[in-house]
Design a protein with these regions (language model features):
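Conserved phosphate-coupling serine/threonine residues in phosphotransfer and NTP-handling enzymes
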Residues: 54-56, 127, 186-188
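Conserved helix/coil segment N-terminal to the catalytic DExD/H
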Residues: 105-147, 157-161
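Post-DEXD/H (motif II) to motif III coupling segment of the RecA-like Helicase ATP-binding lobe
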Residues: 142, 146-150, 154-198
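Walker A/P-loop
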Residues: 45-64, 76
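Conserved nucleic-acid-binding Ia/Ib motif block in the N-terminal RecA-like helicase ATPase lobe
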Residues: 74, 80-126
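Conserved pre-motif I regulatory segment
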Residues: 14-53
């Protein structure tokens, strides 16, 4: 089956944009295996499951499209230390990002929200527990969220070794933000866990 010239040009241009973005912000010349396939799926608007080994570069699969898309990328992650590390790392690359978790004081949350609204952030990291707040979820409606990432997605599944009931709050987000694709990322998942995630 031949690919028409318009499609070929599109794929070539998109591939160049992805590689240039990777180089500009992270200094890498090449993607690792599976990264580009996952990124292209997300940019085509598809809900996507990314099964990649620990250390395989899962963060790049949402950070690169997050820089290309107009608007905000919402990242749901269970570990506060991990979200802090990722936000700090993005800031070192001159990328604006904030985080919210259930343990923040009112003042900390207000300061983070002000940064989110006033500084054109590209990434918003939240703990799944934060999504239990109806007020917080309603505030998400006012944001231009273009991609939703579920890190450690195996925590969704009751079959998983690390099931977290708070991950069930993620269902609300689909109703609140129906048009943004979901990217679920995990290093390991049995067939039962994959079925639950999908």
């Amino acid at each position: 089956k031949s690919i028409n010239s318009t499609s070929l040009i599109y794929f070539t241009i998109m591939s160049d944009i992805l590689t240039l973005t990777l180089k500009k912000y992270w200094g890498f010349d090449f993607f690792r295996p599976l990264q580009k396939d996952i990124i292209k799926s997300v940019l085509d608007g598809h809900d996507t499951l990314g099964l990649m080994p620990t250390g395989g570069g899962k963060s790049i699969t949402f950070q690169v499209p997050g820089m290309i898309l107009e608007g905000l990328t919402l990242v749901i992650t269970p570990l506060i230390s991990l979200m802090k590390d990722q936000v700090d790392n993005l800031k070192r690359h001159n990328i604006r990002a904030v985080y919210f978790h259930a343990g923040m004081t009112h003042r900390e949350a207000t300061t983070a929200w002000d940064k989110l609204i006033n500084s054109k952030c590209k990434f918003l990291y939240v703990s799944p527990e934060r999504l239990s707040s109806e007020r917080f979820c309603n505030e998400l409606k006012s944001l231009n969220i273009r991609l939703i990432v579920i890190d450690e997605a195996h925590c969704i599944s009751q079959w998983g070794y690390d099931f977290r009931p708070s991950y069930l709050n993620i269902k609300k987000i689909r109703k609140i933000i129906p048009n943004a694709p979901f990217l679920a990322l995990t290093a390991t998942a049995t067939p039962e866990v994959v079925t639950d995630i999908c």
